[in-house]
Each structure stands twice: as C-alpha cells, then as structure tokens.
Amino acid sequence: MLTIALSKGRILDDTLPLLAEAGIVPTENPDKSRKLIIPTTQDDVRLLIVRATDVPTYVEHGAADLGVAGKDVLMEYGGQGLYEPLDLQIAQCKLMTAGVVGAAEPKGRLRVATKFVNVAKRYYAEQGRQVDIIKLYGSMELAPLINLADKIIDVVDTGNTLRANGLEPQELIATISSRLVVNKASMKMQHARIQSLIDTLRAAVESRHRG
C-alpha cells in the first residue's frame, strides 16, 4: 500500500491533476467528503487528508510514504528526515517581510510578527539583527497597524491584501512552491514503485510548463 499525505485547499486542487497523470484518482471528492483516508482508482494507493503543517510529520514518521508540502512548511517545520525529489511548481508564492508603506526602519530591536517563527529566527540571525518574534496564526497584516510589530513575515501571492491594509512587501526570504516529499525508509522498501511515480509526476510537471 502506498499512502500519500495531502492537505485540502490550493495544494490539493493543484496536485490531483498531476496524480491523475499517474492514474491515481480519488474515488470520491476529498473537498466534499468527511473521510480523512480516501481510496483511489488504484487499489494499492490511498490519500491521507491532513493539515498542511502536519504533512512533513506524517511522512517523516512513516504514517505516509509520500506527501505534498509547501516549501514554506518544510522550512518552518523541518524536512530533514525526508527526501525532497521534486518541485511540483504548483501553489507558487513568495515568503517575504512586509511593513507599513513609508515607515522608517526602526532602530534597535525589531519586532516581527509571523507564524514562521523558525524561519524568522534564522533569517535575522544570518543578518546579525536582534529581533523579538511575536507568533501569530492569522491576520498578520493587523500587527504593524496597531503597533504590535514593526514588520511581518508572511506568504505573499498577489500582495493585494498587504496593499489594502497600507503595507508593502519588502525583503524576499524565499520563493515558495509545493514539493513532493518521500519517507526515506519507504524509498528503500518500495523504490521501484515510488521512483516510477516520481518520474511520471516529473514528466507531467515538465509537460505542463512546456505547454
């Protein structure tokens, strides 16, 4: 049995057509089903529907053989115990700092609001900058507006939400896309099966971008 961990939303919607190229199609719509384990048209393949931030954990600990996770999640929650053989080039965005338009750069310790705490610590440590990290889970744009933080670190797609709230994207930390991740033990035990799937997905990604 091959188990693939996916999260609902944009990543799932973009991944399903790629899996279909490999003949893997869920037997029911994951967006409408309450089931968390979804069979597929291949009897030996099933999908696990989990939180995006949990995908690396399921794969690393062998509860899933493969998964699809955003690079932002892998950077924040760790992908050290995983193989990352393929950039699926889906769910593309940028991980950036942002601040109030026209605001002066604060002197002294910088206050940064983000849900990407580990990424923020590494980023500012590399700059030798002293920061106070404030962990938030949503509505990041609010923090600089009410003087909770000087800057935020967040995923930016169009930047419309930032601009609507008087903020502007500033420093690029990383370009983000979704990656296929594989459990190391599974890669050894089911090498031919998994490598075949990787090759098929790679061809589908390349074909999509050529087209």
From Swiss-Prot:
Gene Ontology cellular-component annotations: cytoplasm
Subunit structure: Heteromultimer composed of HisG and HisZ subunits.
NCBIfam families on file: hisG
Example GO molecular function: ATP phosphoribosyltransferase activity
UniProt keyword ATP-binding, yes or no: yes
Database matches in SUPFAM superfamilies: Periplasmic binding protein-like II
Domain remarks in the Swiss-Prot or TrEMBL record: Lacks the C-terminal regulatory region which is replaced by HisZ.
Similarity field: Belongs to the ATP phosphoribosyltransferase family. Short subfamily.
Gene that specifies this protein: hisG
Pathway annotation from the record: Amino-acid biosynthesis; L-histidine biosynthesis; L-histidine from 5-phospho-alpha-D-ribose 1-diphosphate: step 1/9
UniProt entry keywords in alphabetical sequence: Amino-acid biosynthesis, ATP-binding, Cytoplasm, Glycosyltransferase, Histidine biosynthesis, Nucleotide-binding, Transferase
Subcellular location: Cytoplasm
Gene3D superfamilies the record matches: Periplasmic binding protein-like II
Documented EC number(s): 2.4.2.17
Short name of any one Pfam family annotated for the protein: HisG
UniProt source species: Pseudomonas putida (strain ATCC 47054 / DSM 6125 / CFBP 8728 / NCIMB 11950 / KT2440)
Single GO biological process annotation from the record: L-histidine biosynthetic process
Lineage of origin: Bacteria, Pseudomonadati, Pseudomonadota, Gammaproteobacteria, Pseudomonadales
Domain of life the protein comes from: Bacteria
Summary of the function given for this chain in its UniProt record: Catalyzes the condensation of ATP and 5-phosphoribose 1-diphosphate to form N'-(5'-phosphoribosyl)-ATP (PR-ATP). Has a crucial role in the pathway because the rate of histidine biosynthesis seems to be controlled primarily by regulation of HisG enzymatic activity.
Reaction it catalyzes: 1-(5-phospho-beta-D-ribosyl)-ATP + diphosphate = 5-phospho-alpha-D-ribose 1-diphosphate + ATP
EC category: transferase
The protein's name: ATP phosphoribosyltransferase
